[in-house]
């Protein structure tokens, strides 16, 4: 795991560190934001890695530039998250007591060009 402050530059730096470590040889990186994943794609390419042939990269957010980068992403529907959070706050402000509970939120896996099966697992 690397810390990358949710920016393209942070994702780039962290991926350079990760891929520069001779003790690890990942076939995939799951990144905590699309911005960082874009930086990871750029770093991998600068190091001569082919995305996705040598390294699959997936982000989270559904960023509008994801299609340009060919980035596989998990889209989270922030409008729905915000609406549900606002409703919970309004109920609390009205004095309504709500027990703690889990809320299942929708998401969508958007598969693009940054992911594939690892080479050693492809049929011969």
Question: What label would you give each PLM region?
Answer:
Residues 14, 20-124:
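Flexible loop/turn connectors
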Residues 8, 12-16:
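Short, well-ordered alpha-helical scaffold segments within catalytic/effector domains
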Residues 1-9, 69:
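Short beta-strand elements in bilobed, periplasmic/extracellular small-molecule ligand-binding domains
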């Amino acid at each position: 795991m690397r810390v990358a402050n949710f920016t393209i530059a942070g994702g780039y730096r962290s991926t350079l560190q990760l891929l520069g470590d001779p003790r690890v040889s990942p076939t995939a990186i799951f990144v905590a934001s699309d911005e960082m994943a874009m930086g990871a794609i750029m770093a991998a390419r600068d190091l001569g890695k082919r995305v996705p042939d040598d390294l699959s990269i997936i982000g989270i957010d559904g960023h509008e530039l994801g299609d340009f980068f060919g980035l596989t992403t998990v889209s989270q529907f922030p409008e729905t998250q915000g609406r549900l959070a606002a409703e919970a706050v309004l109920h609390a402000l009205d004095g309504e007591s709500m027990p703690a509970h889990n809320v299942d939120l929708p998401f969508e896996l958007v598969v693009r060009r940054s992911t594939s099966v690892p080479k050693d697992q492809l049929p011969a």
